A protein has these predicted regions:
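Cysteine-centered catalytic environments shared across enzyme families
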Residues: 1-302
């Protein structure tokens, strides 16, 4: 888990807003205790708080890359599960990599495919990419909305962050709640209507949604929607497909430069995950996996 935030306003010199940007970053410190980074270019500021999982040295953020004379900057929170496939595709197109982080793969996927890169990403993520030459910001959230991304658009600019409190720290956003916010709290809370940020003016990018902010205008696009279809497979086909999809999903999420561990709840789901991961570790000679569970006094009575 990492934290990202940004502020884009061509009428503001972000180099004079460092104290405010620092406060915004501090609100996200628990999301990224290992490193923090700041990028400033005139009216654009990008913030990142990092929890290191992959490529400690070459995965630092904000991350910059150039291609054909154009510069792109990314702040990214997430995990990509088809990193290797995308990297090979990009290498075949002439893109070079200085490390093995998924951040660099996402950035260069955007450099090649622009907004259409979202269709190719398999994972959980929220990220922002600043195109210096176009003076634009691209925001994107994963297909099922695992990673959060809130934003506040105002006359002349936009702020975004992994958490609402980072937006409030900017002082541009006021902690006000209107009728809609009250409805969300008293009738739906702790759930929320998709895209609603509860506080007045704060919105959240929906799952499977991207947005481009350019020329003081935010253009949103839904790149993915879940579709329900009639189930026509036999029992045998269903079992085989479920086994394949589950195994593939678990194995793809075992990539890490840091030690992994598993929490056992005693239920069927966590047991299946550990069994599948254990088989992957055995086949790839990665040693034993670490598991944890909670024990408390008089547990056996309940």
């Amino acid at each position: 888990m990492c934290g990202i935030a940004g502020w884009f306003d061509n009428e503001i010199d972000m180099s004079k807003q460092i104290p405010v940007l620092y406060k915004m970053s501090q609100t996200l410190s628990k999301r990224g205790p290992d490193e923090n980074g700041l990028y400033i270019n005139k009216g654009c500021a990008l913030l990142h708080r990092r929890l290191i999982v992959i490529d400690k040295e070459n995965g630092k953020q904000p991350m910059a890359a150039r291609h054909r004379g154009k510069t792109y900057i990314i702040v990214y929170n997430g995990e990509l599960y088809n990193t290797d496939e995308l990297r090979e595709d990009l290498k075949a197109s002439g893109y070079h990599f200085r490390g093995h982080s998924d951040t660099e793969v996402v950035l260069k996927s955007y450099m090649k495919y622009k907004e259409k890169c979202a269709d190719m990403l398999n994972g959980i993520f929220a990220f922002a990419i600043y195109d210096v030459s176009e003076n634009s910001i691209f925001l994107c959230r994963d297909k099922i909305g695992v990673k959060p991304l809130f934003y506040y658009e105002y006359d002349g600019g936009i702020l975004f962050a992994s958490e609402i409190k980072a937006l409030l720290a900017s002082k541009i956003v006021k902690p006000q709640i209107d009728e809609t916010g009250l409805y969300e709290i008293f009738f739906l809370g702790p759930a929320r209507t998709p895209s609603c940020g509860v506080f007045k003016g704060i919105k959240e990018l929906k799952p499977g949604e991207s947005a481009l902010y350019k020329n003081q205008k935010l253009t949103k696009k839904s790149y993915f929607t879940i579709q329900a279809k009639e189930h026509t497979d036999s029992v045998e086909e269903t079992v085989e497909k479920t086994r394949f999809l589950l195994t593939d999903a678990i194995n793809r999420q075992l990539v890490s430069d840091m030690p992994l561990c598993f929490f056992l709840s005693g239920g069927l789901d966590s047991s299946i995950i550990v069994k599948t991961a254990s088989q992957y570790y055995k086949e790839n000679k990665l040693g034993k996996i670490n598991t944890y569970s909670v024990e408390y006094r008089d547990n056996e009575k309940f």
